[in-house]
Amino acid sequence: MKLIRTIRLDASDTFVFARAAEPTEWAVSGAFVFWNADVEKLEGKARSAFRSGFLGVESLGWSTLVQIVEATDADRAALVERLAQQLVAHFGAPDIASARAAAEEEVAFAESLCNHPTDTLIAVHRTFEDGAVREAFRTLHPRGDRKPMRAFSFLEVEGEEEPADEVNLVALAKNKRAGS
């Protein structure tokens, strides 16, 4: 079986998110964190977590990327149990049985993302459309036979149907100088 773990290729997650997940934590999508939030009003690091974060189950921190890894039945059971504990302690689940059922669904969804080779990286892009959260996932495959451990060492990206957010740094710099 395969599950997803957080991966940190550089230090950017520590700047992008209020709390960055630790590398190699078991992860889930984390969209449930925003169920009661007014996502249209999120700003800054909270908005970044909503738009592009996977939730590290142990730290409840966020990771831009997750890696598909091999897992055992015991790993999966421990992940479900830890997420259930976190749902009770931090997200208002009424009891461990209810939390376990919700955790099972979250882990099953994470598992459904793993229909790619081991070591494939996955990124998420979340939006809020027509009153619902929408998630789109992109996969990054390593070049050649090397494992993906360095930033920018990827060749193939799947799931590029969504338009990318673009920032024109040159125009921003010119506008800043003109306005100064």
Regions found by a protein language model. Give the residues of each.
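Extended, non-catalytic structural segments that build the interaction scaffolds
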Residues: 61-73
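Short acidic alpha-helix initiation/capping motifs at coil-to-helix transition points
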Residues: 75-83
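N-terminal accessory interaction module
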Residues: 1-62, 152-173
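Acidic, proline/glycine-rich low-complexity IDRs
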Residues: 115-180
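Soluble, non-transmembrane alpha-helical interaction regions
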Residues: 74-75, 93-95, 112-124
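Amphipathic alpha-helical segments that form the core helices of the histone-fold
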Residues: 100-114
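Short, surface-exposed acidic
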Residues: 89-104
